[in-house]
Curated annotation (Swiss-Prot):
CoA binds at residues 187, 230, 250. Keywords: Acyltransferase, Metal-binding, Peroxisome, Potassium, Transferase. It comes from Yarrowia lipolytica (strain CLIB 122 / E 150) (Yeast). This is Acetyl-CoA acetyltransferase. One of its GO terms (cellular component) is peroxisome. The lineage of its organism: Eukaryota, Fungi, Dikarya, Ascomycota, Saccharomycotina.
Amino acid sequence: MRLTLPRLNAAYIVGAARTPVGKFNGALKSVSAIDLGITAAKAAVQRSKVPADQIDEFLFGQVLTANSGQAPARQVVIKGGFPESVEATTINKVCSSGLKTVALAAQAIKAGDRNVIVAGGMESMSNTPYYSGRGLVFGNQKLEDSIVKDGLWDPYNNIHMGNCCENTNKRDGITREQQDEYAIESYRRANESIKNGAFKDEIVPVEIKTRKGTVTVSEDEEPKGANAEKLKGLKPVFDKQGSVTAGNASPINDGASAVVVASGTKAKELGTPVLAKIVSYADAATAPIDFTIAPSLAIPAALKKAGLTKDDIALWEINEAFSGVALANLMRLGIDKSKVNVKGGAVALGHPIGASGNRIFVTLVNALKEGEYGVAAICNGGGASTAIVIKKVSSVE
């Protein structure tokens, strides 16, 4: 007897929103990761026009969950006013977390397990605590920064993520000048995008209540005040003889982002707007010290699944954990840098680690034109990466 397998459901993006990205201890420092996630999720759902009772699950990425409370993704659901019947799962794939949620949402929809999923990422690096060990009886106690411990430290080689990038730069011959020039261009693109309102369709303002009234944050905070000459004069951070500086690396930030992923059948049934179709996705891994080049492995895998080549791709979003990361992957993939991070990247806009994968995805969805293909990819600690291929469409295919 021959079995007939059911046709897989196609997954579509029907809503997308992100908060502005705040500086470390900046405009968003008083807002928790949960509240940032709620802001992004509510806006994405509102824009999708999907009734809240039609949502099956929330998948939310967060890396620095310490002191956020139990089940952060579930808190976004309950505190956000969504039905208690909506399931929720928190995802930690380090910096890939927010993009992995989109891939997992697409998988569940293709399998027929879910019809509508809110996939996002959130991080408040300004609100992360310090750790102290238990059982102190007498004497001094050392504190550990949870940002470094759980987010920015390679536990396999016992070095900072920045040292991994230094290793890549030396091996690939990437110079300090190349990294600085790349960073300066990222800042230029970001500031130009802010000035021209290029982010207005993706950003939802964050309202902060203070004793003096309500403060509204509506623009990315990090790019403002960038100075090319000062950037070129900064000293290396991780290796005195190295080339990675605070200026050509991504900063520490706060922010959240979310998309609503729906099956084509459900999107038609609900009459939702359609923003893009998820074509394929892939993960790839290599040695932990080489996490920097992992996107160059995940991207070809995703393209192969889509039946596409790099020449079919109109725009790329490759997360700029460091300028050296972007340069190393562009070199390996042979991509035209004029098509990469056209609105500026994480070096300029910021890198709230649990949210960044979703942020670049939302930016890509908004940047593409009808019928164009785009790729979003991001590396993560441990030597891995996630990549997603999408097609810009305005209706279910």
